[in-house]
């Protein structure tokens, strides 16, 4: 099993798909990496030579921000938005959608389950 950027790639998948198991690498970036390193995208991970695995590992380490570094960068960006008090930062702080979606109805994923407001009756 090939281990790249701290992630074990599945042996039975094509390299093009297997690279997408690494956080920060999707299909387009996977194809770009394979073209740059000269590895055939149709090769199965189990059939990769040690040299090909090392080329992929070196290229990803030097040229692509992945896994922990990328997660840290994203969380720091969100934290920065919250600190400067911009609109997007306020939406993050309140747990509401950030990209302009409606919130009168929907947005349940971001807002969480409904809180039913009870009615108090006079006695």
Curated annotation (Swiss-Prot):
One of its GO terms (molecular function) is structural constituent of ribosome. GO terms for cellular component: cytosol; small ribosomal subunit. InterPro entries: Rbsml_uS13_C, Ribosomal_uS13, Ribosomal_uS13-like_H2TH, Ribosomal_uS13_bac-type, Ribosomal_uS13_CS. PROSITE patterns: RIBOSOMAL_S13_1, RIBOSOMAL_S13_2. Keywords: Ribonucleoprotein, Ribosomal protein, RNA-binding, rRNA-binding, tRNA-binding. Residues 97-123 are annotated as: Disordered. It comes from the Bacteria. GO terms for biological process: translation. Located at the top of the head of the 30S subunit, it contacts several helices of the 16S rRNA. In the 70S ribosome it contacts the 23S rRNA (bridge B1a) and protein L5 of the 50S subunit (bridge B1b), connecting the 2 subunits; these bridges are implicated in subunit movement. Contacts the tRNAs in the A and P-sites. Part of the 30S ribosomal subunit. Forms a loose heterodimer with protein S19. Forms two bridges to the 50S subunit in the 70S ribosome. HAMAP family: Ribosomal_uS13 (MF_01315). This is Small ribosomal subunit protein uS13.
């Amino acid at each position: 099993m090939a281990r790249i950027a701290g992630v074990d790639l599945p042996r039975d998948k094509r390299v093009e798909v297997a690279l997408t198991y690494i956080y920060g690498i999707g299909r387009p970036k996977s194809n770009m990496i394979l073209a740059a390193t000269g590895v055939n995208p149709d090769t199965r991970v189990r059939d990769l030579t040690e040299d090909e695995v090392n080329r992929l590992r070196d290229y990803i380490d030097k040229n692509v921000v992945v896994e922990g570094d990328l997660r840290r960068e994203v969380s720091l960006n969100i934290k920065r938005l919250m600190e400067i008090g911009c609109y997007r930062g306020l939406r993050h702080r309140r747990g509401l959608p950030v990209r302009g979606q409606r919130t009168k109805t929907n947005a349940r994923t971001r807002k969480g389950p409904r809180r039913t407001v009870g009615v108090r009756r006079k006695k």
